[in-house]
Amino acid sequence: MLVARDQERLAVLADDLATSYGVQSEVLVADLSQRDGMAVVEARLSDASRPVDLVVNNAGFGLKRRFLDNDVEQEQAALDVLVTAVMRLTHAALGPMTARGSGGIINVASVAAYQPRGSYSAAKAWVTTFGAWAAQEYGEQGVRIMTLCPGFTRTEFHARMDVRREAVPRPLWLDVDRVVDEALADWDAGKPLSIPSKRYKAIATLSRHLPTSVLHRFQSLGRR
């Protein structure tokens, strides 16, 4: 099942999956910054007659400007996608999963969760904390939950935020395939938290101990 707000791109992706891997995909067009969009996906996930074995909450976007420079409705939309949608879709999926005693959820956060990076960082910190609790709470009922915290990854996400790649040290950039491979390896190993690459594991660990002033310099990387 594929979920996004761009129907045309979803159709292209579904066709590609069918052609390349012989996978038939169910497509749901939904804007997860809107409650009615969330409701469409919630209804599908809570339908016990059509069980979903694994949910990956990967919807998200970042805002180009700093907190006070953004319209408050932009901040609210980001919060709805990054936090509210994760909470509601996890809640919807957990009902059927706990009832049958199996299933899994991967919530995509960010290594930014460990750094002072405005409302985006705060949202990802919520996902990380929520995931750590949920993994323990529902693991006893047969449902696995893992939080994925990638760093700078070569996707259109950072381009849309006007992040200058050349301003970020090359060793900090990760390829999508590497992030996916390490995340799936951690999933297979039963880990509740996945931080791809040793360097980002080190950054996450150090971030818990470094002064906020030092972390603030790091969080400005790539900003115009």
Annotate each predicted stretch with a short phrase:
Residues 90-91, 132:
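A short, exposed helix-loop element centered on a Lys and neighboring polar residues
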Residues 1-12:
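Conserved glycine-rich Rossmann-like NAD(P)H-binding loop of the short-chain dehydrogenase/reductase
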Residues 58-63:
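Conserved NAD(P)H cofactor-binding loop of Rossmann-fold oxidoreductase domains
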Residues 66-79:
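Substrate-binding pocket helix/loop in short-chain dehydrogenase/reductase
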Residues 110:
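Residue(s) in the substrate-gating loop at a strand-loop-helix junction
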Residues 90, 123-126:
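Active-site helix of classical SDR
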Residues 147, 167-203:
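C-terminal helical subdomain
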